[in-house]
């Protein structure tokens, strides 16, 4: 699973959880109706994974749900742009 695909899966995981979604919206300041457009931006997707990895129980739950190791989530997060020019869309 590529970095963007993992971030989109994480976004779905967040959206499906009635406790996580309000927390995500509050922390990011994004409105629910704006998520679809924002999800087209690799920087937003990096933020989704940052949200997941910032809370270990959420990271573990997502990794189990996605069938990946928690380290793979961290690797995907690092592969997405985070305000630098080193982003490689093919990673």
Residues covered by each model-derived region:
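Metal- and O2-centered redox machinery and metal/ROS homeostasis
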Residues: 1-91
């Amino acid at each position: 699973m590529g970095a963007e695909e993992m971030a989109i899966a994480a976004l779905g995981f967040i959206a499906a959880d009635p406790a996580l979604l309000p927390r995500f919206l509050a922390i990011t300041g994004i409105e629910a109706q704006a998520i679809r457009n924002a999800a087209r931006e690799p920087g937003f997707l990096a933020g989704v994974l940052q949200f997941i990895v910032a809370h270990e129980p959420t990271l573990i739950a997502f990794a189990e749900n996605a069938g990946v190791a928690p380290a793979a989530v961290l690797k995907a997060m690092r592969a997405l742009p985070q305000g630098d020019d080193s982003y490689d869309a093919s990673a």
